Amino acid sequence: MEYYNVGKIVNTHGVRGEVRVLATTDFIDERFAKGNTLYLQQSGEPLPLTIESTRQHKGFVLVKFVGYDNINDVEQFRDHELMVSADDQQPLDDGQYYYHQIIGLDVETTDGRHLGKIKEILSPGANDVWVVERPEKRDLLLPVIDEVVKNVDLDKNFVTVELMEGLE
């Protein structure tokens, strides 16, 4: 089964078994809802954890898991990734994609010139930015806006872009 990151446990919170999670998902309310199962990345098979309660606190998501009732139970989870199974992913609207679908795609210009591969996605604010790794050149930062991204073809594993002046 495939798993995808939705957050990282960065610390414990209090003494009653809560953990502080830095969420990396756009679906915080859905992913961290009471009763949902998340999987803890560890060596070997991921550990399934059922959410008992969730609350927001100072930019983090505080999560309590069923059966983990004190700080000693959850201390071992610190610095581990929380994941969701591929079966539990939310359906997206047309034109929306999960990061794992975009990373690794080839990037071509509208005139057919190959630029490189998307290696990372940044989320600095108003729109995402795709980091394109180019052979023997510095990475190219592409804003994910309609004026730049013209087509995403997941079946053929490539993206067509129109470079605005100053991007390259």
UniProtKB/Swiss-Prot annotation:
Biological process, per Gene Ontology: ribosomal small subunit biogenesis; rRNA processing
Broad class of the protein's primary localization: cytoplasm
Keywords assigned by UniProt, alphabetized: Chaperone, Cytoplasm, Ribosome biogenesis, rRNA processing
GO cellular component, one term: cytoplasm
GO molecular function annotations of the record: ribosome binding
Subunit description: Binds ribosomal protein uS19.
NCBIfam families: 16S_RimM
The name this protein goes by in its record: Ribosome maturation factor RimM
Gene: rimM
